[in-house]
């Protein structure tokens, strides 16, 4: 199963649509947004995927103040907004999604060994640098970077048991 992963879109509809286009081209079956969406119009763009059966999951980031509107937008497009920490299972893998602003909480989740994959955002920097994933305590740890246009390097990922990074 291919899974699209992005974070920190910060209301950038153009780059969000670029990521969605790449997710469509690669036939992803699910998309994970690791927070800092900012406002509902960004989420409505994902309808292009969810109307074709792609599952959409997201969590709140530290800049997501319009929580009720975001929750409604996820419901309208058929996605699930999972709160501050998301726990899902896809293709037999247990995922934890956390924006990552609290480093101690992030470390505690990774050290728990309860998840196969830990996805985080917040730093606007792809992690780990130079490679697509790092395994810590038997958990795949990744940060797709940021998809917003203010950033020097705009990136997202998709997971197919091999992680592929791409630039927007």
Over which residues does each language-model region extend?
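Histidine (H) residue identity feature
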Residues: 10, 26, 33, 99, ...
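Active-site-proximal beta-strand elements of phosphoester/diester hydrolases
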Residues: 2-10, 92-101, 139-145
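Generic beta-strand structural signal
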Residues: 33, 89-90, 135, 163
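Active-site-proximal segments of metal-dependent phosphoesterases and phosphodiesterases across multiple
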Residues: 64-113, 148-151
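Short, Asp-centered acidic motifs that coordinate Mg2+ and/or phosphate
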Residues: 30, 95, 116-117
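Conserved beta-sheet core of the metallophosphoesterase superfamily
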Residues: 55-57, 101-162, 166-168
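Core catalytic region of metal-dependent phosphoesterases/phosphodiesterases
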Residues: 2-89
């Amino acid at each position: 199963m291919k899974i699209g992963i992005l974070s920190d879109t910060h209301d950038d509809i153009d780059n969000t649509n670029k990521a969605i286009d790449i997710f469509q081209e690669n036939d992803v079956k699910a998309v994970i947004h690791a927070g800092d969406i900012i406002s509902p119009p960004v989420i409505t763009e994902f309808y292009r995927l969810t109307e074709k059966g792609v599952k959409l999951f997201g969590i709140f980031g530290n800049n997501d103040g319009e929580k009720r509107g975001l929750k409604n937008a996820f419901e309208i497009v058929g996605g699930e907004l999972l709160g501050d920490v998301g726990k899902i299972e896809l293709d037999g893998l247990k995922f934890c999604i956390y924006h990552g602003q609290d480093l101690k909480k992030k470390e505690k989740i990774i050290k728990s060994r309860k998840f196969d994959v830990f996805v985080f955002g917040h730093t606007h920097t792809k992690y780990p640098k130079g490679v697509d994933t790092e395994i810590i305590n038997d958990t795949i740890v990744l940060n797709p970077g940021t998809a917003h246009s203010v950033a020097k390097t705009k990136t997202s990922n998709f997971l197919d048991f091999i992680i592929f990074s791409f630039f927007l």
